Regions:
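Beta-sheet-dominated interaction scaffolds and their linkers
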Residues: 26-51, 151-160
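Asparagine-centered strand-capping/turn motif at beta-strand->loop junctions
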Residues: 52-56, 168-176
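Intrinsically disordered, low-complexity Pro/Gly/Ser/Thr-rich segments with frequent PxxP/GP/PP motifs
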Residues: 75-104, 187-211
Length: 233
């Protein structure tokens, strides 16, 4: 599912609209898309890569990429090459991402975000203000240490749920970030939520919920939904 945020950027003779989305080759008939909706950087890997594709038949894009921390700051712990380049029409390129920072926690995943901004070129200067649309795709980047007790595939079933009056608490006792999708409490749909390793999240009991039972799916390393599970107490 895409989450898009828009904000206006005003320059001389230019009003730019910056769109921030997550996508997998989601460029439609003309634009820039990414080859993944999330990345996993396993400890010990020299680098990982992310494909970028320009599906426009005639518009080149300037591509700029960087890695961010969860508090929306640029991370100095990663290098992306090339950090800035022109992606010609109907063309693809690979971004290579390398971790150069200090050792991270060994008992859990760490979360970062990969940001790819695409600015279309303009070949003619029009009179007055022109509208220029840039896209900024932001996807999760998980740094995963070696030697975790079990693989990600076993983690979703380990979630535990507790009823608390008008709340339901979902606990994640695993070393993985787990994104809950198709989440229902008492048969009522609840907004998707990511729960950090060894953390918990309290959901208000939805209006009209028949009980506090919880069903959910999660997102795997490939961005696909896993089979539905019933949360155990």
């Amino acid at each position: 599912m895409k989450t898009c945020i828009t904000k206006g950027i005003v320059t001389v003779s230019l009003t730019a609209i910056l769109l921030s989305c997550s996508s997998t080759w989601a460029a439609g008939k003309g634009g820039v898309g990414l080859a993944a909706t999330r990345l996993v950087y396993s400890e010990g890997e020299e680098q990982i890569s992310l494909g970028v594709r320009n599906t426009s038949p005639d518009v080149p894009y300037l591509i700029q990429s960087w890695v961010m921390t969860p508090d929306n700051k640029k991370s100095a712990d990663f290098i992306i090459t090339p950090p800035l380049f022109v992606l010609n029409p109907a063309n693809e390129n690979l971004l290579r991402i390398m971790y150069i920072g200090a050792p991270l926690a060994k008992d859990r995943e760490n979360l970062f975000f990969t940001s790819v901004r695409a600015v279309p070129s303009t070949t003619k200067r029009k009179e007055g203000n022109t509208l220029k649309i840039a896209t900024q795709s932001v996807i999760k980047l998980f740094w995963r240490p070696k030697g975790l007790a079990y693989p990600l595939g076993e983690a979703p079933a380990k979630l535990r749920c507790t009823s608390l009056a008008d709340m339901v608490m979902v606990s994640n006792p695993t070393p993985y970030f787990i994104t809950l999708t198709d989440l229902k409490i008492g048969g009522k749909v609840v907004k998707n939520q990511m729960i950090s390793p060894f953390d918990k999240y309290q959901f208000p009991l939805p209006k009209g919920a028949q009980n506090s039972s919880v069903t959910y799916r999660t997102i795997n390393d490939y961005g696909a939904e896993t089979p539905q599970l019933n949360c155990k107490s």
